From Swiss-Prot:
Top-tier EC class: transferase
Major localisation: cytoplasm
Identification of the protein by name: Phosphoglycerate kinase
Residues that, per the record, bind substrate: 19-21, 34, 57-60, 116, 149
Lineage: Bacteria, Pseudomonadati, Thermomicrobiota, Thermomicrobia, Thermomicrobiales
Database matches in PROSITE patterns: PGLYCERATE_KINASE (PS00111)
Length: 392
């Protein structure tokens, strides 16, 4: 894959696609992780006095201008992190954007408006891509989180300019390739989250090489049901129970150790946190639902994690948005951070737990991609990565 090191960038206009799809509250950025992740690329370009034109999407405006999804607050946050002005325009490819691109001096940074305000972005529209390309001399994609989208700023524009990956994109692909290609053993797969359907592809692609599969979150209930256990009022994908059984059979045939929760935290409802209690999985009351894994499960999983040479963790062990149901996820986060092997953690709640505990620096790679990371682990080709591997 071509990287930014392969481009002539000195004093040139560089269109940089970033993934600044960050949470905003009251017009302020509340989590700048994705912005910080692009700083190595931007600082490298600024050292070479490039004229940087940033473009990103934010939220799902569906081709309409929505005031609360403008990128000005993101530009302000980036400005503080870079220690220099970031000029944001309220335009994507129109006169204001063209004027900003023309006036940019070497070592300056500008930011286009939210790409998804224009419906042509998500259509991978050739005309829109040409208008973006006309603003710059070359293109850098540092938006791994959007690499699974065949959109104009991800795919079409990369074919119109000398193009390459930024350092974040490079790091993401290298980490994921290591997981997919490495023969380091034991290889442990830790999967959580609500739905089996979201993780089936990952399990099917990685199970043939895994030594252990540890399951938590709502998806574990579907596997417990496949093992013939009662799960009370818990979230279960009934139509996926046969699929879960097939995976359990496949794992058994391949000698893969599958660990399901041994004890769980139950409550009558998600909001009835004061009534929560820990029960063995064999004794889930019919009027209660599972909202987290229990301490015995955390200990058992932690012992398996400690011996891993290669580990992938994606998805929380419980309902992470409710503080009382975070303990299982936190316990797994501590175990993963303590693992001496190479650890790759998919974003979302898994990453949030590591950051909350101050352990983010202790994992091998903390991915910024949500859907993109899952699709890569499924063995699928990502359009935004594939285009950077095409012959120039």
């Amino acid at each position: 894959m071509r990287t930014v090191r392969d481009l002539e960038v000195e004093e040139r206009r560089v269109l940089v696609r970033v993934d600044y799809n960050v949470p905003l509250e009251g017009g302020r950025v509340v989590d700048d992780t994705r912005i910080r992740a692009t700083l190595p690329t931007l600082q490298w370009l600024l050292e070479r006095r490039a004229r940087i034109i940033l473009c990103s999407h934010l939220g799902r405006p569906k081709g309409q201008v929505r005031e609360e999804l403008r990128l000005a607050p993101v530009a302000a946050t980036l400005s503080g992190l870079l220690g220099q002005p970031v000029r944001s325009v309220r335009d994507i490819v129109g006169p204001e954007a063209q004027e900003m691109a023309r006036r940019l001096q070497p070592g300056e940074v500008g930011m286009l408006e939210n790409l998804r305000f224009d419906p042509r972005e998500e259509q991978n529209d050739a005309e829109f891509a040409a208008a973006l390309a006309a603003l710059a001399d070359c293109y850098v994609n540092d938006a791994f989180g959007a690499a699974h989208r065949a959109h104009a700023s991800v795919v079409a524009v990369a074919r119109l300019l000398p193009s390459a990956a930024g350092f974040l994109m490079e790091r993401e692909v290298q980490a994921l390739e290591r997981v997919l290609r490495s023969d380091e053993r034991p290889f442990v797969l830790v999967l959580g989250g609500a739905k089996v359907s979201d993780k089936i592809g990952v399990i099917e692609n990685l199970l043939p090489r895994a030594d252990a599969l540890l399951l938590g979150g709502g998806m574990a209930n579907t596997f417990l049901r496949a093992r013939g256990l009662e799960t009370g009022r818990s979230l279960v994908e009934e139509e996926k129970v046969p699929e879960a059984q097939r995976i359990l059979d496949l794992a058994a045939a391949r000698g893969v150790r599958v660990e399901l929760p041994r004890d769980v935290v139950v409550a009558p409802t998600m909001s009835a946190v004061s009534q929560r209690r820990i029960v063995p999985v064999t004794a889930i009351p019919p009027d209660q639902a599972v909202y987290d894994i229990g301490p015995e499960t955390v200990r058992a999983y932690s012992a398996v994690i400690a011996g891993a040479r290669l580990l992938v963790w994606n998805g929380p062990m419980g309902v992470y948005e409710v503080p009382e149901f975070r303990e299982g996820t936190k316990g797994i986060a501590e175990a993963v951070a303590g693992c001496s092997g190479f650890t790759l953690v998919g974003g979302g709640d898994s990453a949030a737990a590591l950051q909350e505990l101050g352990l983010a620096e202790r994992v091998g790679h903390l991915s910024t991609g949500g859907g993109a990371t899952l699709e890569y682990l499924e063995g699928r080709e990502l359009p935004g990565v594939a285009v950077l591997m095409e012959e120039a």
